[in-house]
From Swiss-Prot:
Binding site for Mn(2+) 1: D8, H10, D41, H204
Top-tier EC class: hydrolase
Function: Hydrolyzes the pyrophosphate bond of UDP-2,3-diacylglucosamine to yield 2,3-diacylglucosamine 1-phosphate (lipid X) and UMP by catalyzing the attack of water at the alpha-P atom. Involved in the biosynthesis of lipid A, a phosphorylated glycolipid that anchors the lipopolysaccharide to the outer membrane of the cell.
Cofactor binding summary note: Binds 2 Mn(2+) ions per subunit in a binuclear metal center.
A GO biological process held by the record: lipid A biosynthetic process
Keywords for the protein's UniProt record, in alphabetical order: Cell inner membrane, Cell membrane, Hydrolase, Lipid A biosynthesis, Lipid biosynthesis, Lipid metabolism, Manganese, Membrane, Metal-binding
Residues at which Mn(2+) 2 binds: D41, N79, H114, H202
Protein known as: UDP-2,3-diacylglucosamine hydrolase
The species this protein was found in: Xanthomonas oryzae pv. oryzae (strain KACC10331 / KXO85)
Lineage per the UniProt record: Bacteria, Pseudomonadati, Pseudomonadota, Gammaproteobacteria, Lysobacterales
NCBIfam families for this protein: lipid_A_lpxH, PRK05340.1
Topology in membrane: Peripheral membrane protein
PANTHER family listed in its UniProt record: UDP-2,3-DIACYLGLUCOSAMINE HYDROLASE (PTHR34990:SF1), UDP-2,3-DIACYLGLUCOSAMINE HYDROLASE-RELATED (PTHR34990)
Length: 247
C-alpha cells in the first residue's frame, strides 16, 4: 500500500486545465491508497468557506468521493488557503491538520509541514504570517462582507507580486535565499522534534535532500507544484518516489 502527498496546486479559475488534471488524478490515481495528504496551497486564494466557487465545489465533491471510497484525506493549510475552515472540510470529506504535524508512516515517524515556517530569512513574510494566522484577526476578517475580503486579497496579492519583482531586480542569489528554506531552521526543526524525516511543500523545488542535524543523518523531502504539470510523492514501506505527470 502507498501513501500519497501533494501540495501547491494553487487551483484557480484562471487555470482550469490544472483543476481538471487534479480531478482526473483523484479519479484515477488515489483509489486504493492508504491516505492522501494535501500539504497546503490547494487553492490559489481562499477568503472564506462562504465564497461562491464552482471549481471549489467540484473539488469538494471529488475529494469526498475519495474519502467515501475508503481513502482518508488530510489537509494542512498553506500560505494561500489558511482560511479553509471546518465547513469546507466537511463538504470535502477531509480532516484539517495543524502545521506542523507528526505522523507514523509504516513505522517511520515523520514530520509534515507546509514549509513556509522554514523560510525564516523572509522576515517580512513571517511577520505577515504571524498577523494573518492570529485567531482574532481571522475572526474579524471573516466577519467582513465578501466584497471587502475580495479587495483585501487582491491588495495582498499585488503587494506580494511587487515584492517578488523587487527582489528579482536585485541579486538573484539573494532571491533564492529569501524564498527558500533556511538551512539553519531546517536543522533546528529536526533537532526540536527529534525526527529524521520531514516532508513539506511551499518552495516549489521538488527534491530529496540529505541533512545533518544533531549528529543524525536526516531526510527532507520537498513536494513539487502543479503550475505546468502534476506532482505527487508516493511513499510506502519500501521507499519514496517523487513523480511528475503532464497535462
Amino acid at each position: 500500500m502507498t501513501t500519497l502527498f501533494i501540495s501547491d496546486l494553487h487551483l484557480d479559475p484562471a487555470r482550469p486545465a490544472i483543476t481538471e488534471l487534479f480531478l482526473d488524478f483523484l479519479r484515477t490515481q488515489v483509489r486504493g491508497s492508504d491516505a492522501l495528504y494535501i500539504l497546503g496551497d490547494l487553492f490559489e486564494a481562499w477568503i472564506g468557506d462562504d465564497t461562491p466557487s464552482t471549481a471549489a465545489d467540484a473539488v469538494a465533491v471529488a475529494l469526498h468521493a475519495v474519502a467515501d471510497a475508503g481513502v482518508p484525506v488530510f489537509f494542512m493549510a498553506g500560505n494561500r488557503d489558511f482560511l479553509v475552515g471546518e465547513t469546507y472540510a466537511q463538504r470535502a470529506g477531509f480532516r484539517i491538520l495543524p502545521d506542523p504535524t507528526v505522523i507514523d508512516l509504516y513505522g517511520h515517524t515523520t514530520l509534515l509541514m507546509h514549509g513556509d515556517l522554514l523560510c525564516t530569512d523572509d522576515t517580512a513574510y513571517q511577520a505577515f504570517r504571524a498577523q494573518t494566522r492570529d485567531p482574532v484577526f481571522q475572526a474579524q476578517f471573516l466577519a467582513q462582507p465578501l466584497a471587502a475580503r475580495v479587495a483585501f486579497a487582491q491588495q495582498a496579492r499585488a503587494a506580494s507580486q511587487a515584492r517578488h519583482a523587487e527582489l528579482k531586480q536585485g541579486d538573484q542569489s539573494n532571491v533564492e535565499t529569501v524564498t527558500d528554506v533556511s538551512p539553519a531552521e531546517v536543522e533546528a526543526t529536526f533537532v526540536r522534534y527529534g525526527l529524521d524525516r520531514l516532508i513539506h511543500g511551499h518552495t516549489h523545488r521538488p527534491a530529496i535532500h540529505t541533512v545533518q542535524a544533531g549528529g543524525n543523518t536526516c531526510t527532507r523531502i520537498v513536494l513539487g507544484d502543479w503550475y505546468e504539470q502534476g506532482s505527487v510523492l508516493r511513499l510506502d514501506a519500501d521507499g519514496v518516489s517523487l513523480e511528475q505527470f503532464a497535462l
